[in-house]
């Protein structure tokens, strides 16, 4: 029961009153929404932003459950306020929420080992890449593009490098490497290694 409580509310929030907990959740939801509205550039299935960094920070501070809720709602609110004229893709919000959830779970386990925080950050980055970027976001956009019809640049890229078969692996390579989504992820990961140790989460 105590372990569950630490997952629900991390040490920074556990002793706060219910009112302060609600205020912090609302604050991080607004922070996530502002990030989605003003600190990102969306180009259909690509997104260049600080969303990963903000979502990790939110999950660390609020814990996995409320971190997920704050980031998912923040993404939804951000879309309604500033949609960039695009459709709402629910898997983007799901991915954002999962980033916070993963971060909250990983950092909930305390250890006194030297350098443990760097190991935690590395685990968060790897899980984000495979769970959020690949399994959720890229899969969602691949299925959407497949249903709506792949773009000519994508088909040309696939034809040149994979012989014309636009399967998931080919689309993933196109999205991550040709269009540069991996650069955005790497930039956010670098920020995490730079900034998160300041939170003293060992």
Predicted regions and their residues:
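Loop-helix junctions at membrane interfaces
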Residues: 1-202
């Amino acid at each position: 029961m105590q372990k569950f409580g630490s997952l629900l509310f991390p040490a920074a929030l556990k002793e706060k009153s219910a009112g302060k907990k609600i205020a912090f959740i609302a604050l991080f939801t607004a922070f996530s929404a502002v990030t989605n509205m003003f600190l990102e550039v969306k180009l259909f299935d690509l997104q260049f932003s600080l969303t990963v960094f903000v979502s990790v920070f939110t999950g660390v501070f609020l814990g996995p459950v409320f971190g997920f809720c704050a980031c998912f709602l923040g993404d939804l609110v951000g879309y309604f306020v500033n949609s960039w004229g695009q459709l709402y893709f629910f898997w983007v919000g799901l991915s954002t929420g999962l980033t916070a959830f993963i971060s909250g779970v990983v950092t909930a386990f305390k250890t006194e080992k030297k350098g443990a925080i760097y190991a935690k950050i590395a685990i968060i980055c790897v899980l984000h890449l495979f769970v959020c970027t690949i399994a959720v976001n890229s899969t969602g956009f691949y299925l959407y593009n497949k249903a709506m019809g792949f773009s000519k640049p994508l088909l040309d890229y696939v034809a040149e490098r994979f012989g014309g078969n636009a399967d998931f692996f080919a689309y993933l390579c196109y999205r991550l490497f040709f269009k540069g989504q991996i650069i955005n992820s790497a930039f956010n990961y670098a920020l995490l290694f730079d900034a998160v140790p300041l939170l003293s989460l060992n």
